Amino acid sequence: DDLKLEATKVSYHLRESGEKVAVIGGFNSESLFTPVEEMGQKTTLLDRQSLLQACGRGYFIVGILGPGQEPTNHALHDIAALKSDLEKWNRKMVLLFPDEEQYKKFQPTEFPGLPSTIIYGIDTDGNIQKQITESMKLSSSAALPVFIIADTFNRVVFVSQGYTIGLGEQLMKVIHGL
C-alpha cells in the first residue's frame, strides 16, 4: 500500500470570444442613485439622478463598494494604479455605497491616486446592486465589490464580483476593445 504522489502538469487555455467585446447582459442606465459631494466629515447628499444624467452618453463603469472590506480595498488600489489610463479614456466611473452609513466609513486617503473621473454616490434603496445581481445572474448580492462596464444603450460588456486579481487590467482590456 505504498502510494506515491506524482505531480502532473496540465496546460490551461482560457478561450476567449473572437469578437473584441461581447454584450453579456443588460442594465438600465436610467437607474437612479444619490450623488455625494465632499468626502470625509462634511457630507452633502445631492438630488437623485440617473447614471445617464451623471455620465452622459456612451460607456461608463459602475462599482458597488464594501468599504473597509479587503476585496474592495484591493479593487480600489488596482484602479488607482491605472489612474492615467482611466483618465485618458475620459468616461465616468460611478462608485456607489450600499447606504449613507457605509459611505461614511470610506476613507479616500487610503487610496491615493484614484482617477479624477470618479463620481461617488449612494445606491438609493439598493436598486442598482439588485438590478446588476439579477440581470447578470450573480450568485449573491452580498459579495462586494461588483463592477460593470455598460453603455447608455443598456448593454453590459464586463462584470466582476468579489475578490478579483488585476481588476484594473481587466477593465482596461475591455475598454481598449470598445
Put a short name on every predicted segment.
Residues 1-40, 71, 84-87, 127:
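Oxidative protein folding and maturation machinery
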Residues 3-22, 142-178:
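Thiol-/selenol-based redox modules, centered on thioredoxin-like
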Residues 21-60, 68, 77-81:
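A short beta-strand-turn-helix
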Residues 50-54, 131-138:
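Short amphipathic alpha-helix with an adjacent loop that forms part of the alpha/beta core around
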Residues 55-60, 87-93, 115-117, 144, ...:
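Loop/turn elements at helix/coil->beta-strand transitions in domains of secreted/extracellular proteins
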Residues 60, 64-114, 127-133:
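Structural microenvironment flanking redox-active thiols in thiol-disulfide oxidoreductases
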Residues 115-119, 134-148:
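Structural micro-motif
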Residues 117-127:
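Short acidic-hydrophobic, aromatic-tinged amphipathic segments that line or gate anion-handling sites
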